[in-house]
Amino acid sequence: MAVEGTAFDFRTPHAIGDMIDADNEQLKNGRGYDMNWVLNREDNGEVVKVMSIYEPQSGRAMDVLTDQIAMQFYSGNFFDGTYDGKYSKPLAFRESVVFETQKYPDAVNHSNFPSVILTPDEEYKHTCIYHFYISR
């Protein structure tokens, strides 16, 4: 799916909440972001920065570096205070985000996707670095 001009286009930085409630079937079904992004890179094992997130009020920031070709992004759409997070604080609706680096979902069923088959003689390894810092 091409992201240009859609709520899924984060190539130019903007707040996650800017378009989270856009008139889009995928966003409505997921009550927000819960999609996999193709990272437009080769599956060559090189670790590169694939995304950054920044909270301007506190200056908290995070970069994600990986050797993977895709990333799942979830915006806490089904948290309702039922479950506790850090320090026993209830997890509220859209109060958190998740970034999971990975291969393409359902790749095992698509011969045109990079293989995710691991044979008994192979070892699996991938790298994901979450770099936290303050940016002012």
Regions found by a protein language model. Give the residues of each.
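Active-site pocket scaffolds in enzymes
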Residues: G5-R136
